């Protein structure tokens, strides 16, 4: 990506939303804006079927990060810039968090030269082979 990147998260981001938000912040891709994620990253595998067809699950998979270990679970990830969405924002069709992210991206663009990517040479030939290997 050439140019600045910002990401939004909030208290409704859990599971992959927690993981993405934390990885985005940990790798320093750009500023993370919004509210702290809810902290539910333990994975399940619905593989135990009961006689009535219902399926049971139990916590099985945990996520570990180089900077905080297992600490995203039960806490979440704090954004770099906290932006509250007021309770009436949805009713008024107002997205304060999105507006803040766009404003931040535009601020970052002011100090970042952005242009077309450099020529990387000839593109690879991606046509399928005429015959598939046996």
Language model feature labels by segment:
Residues 1-134:
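C-terminal "post-core" interaction segments
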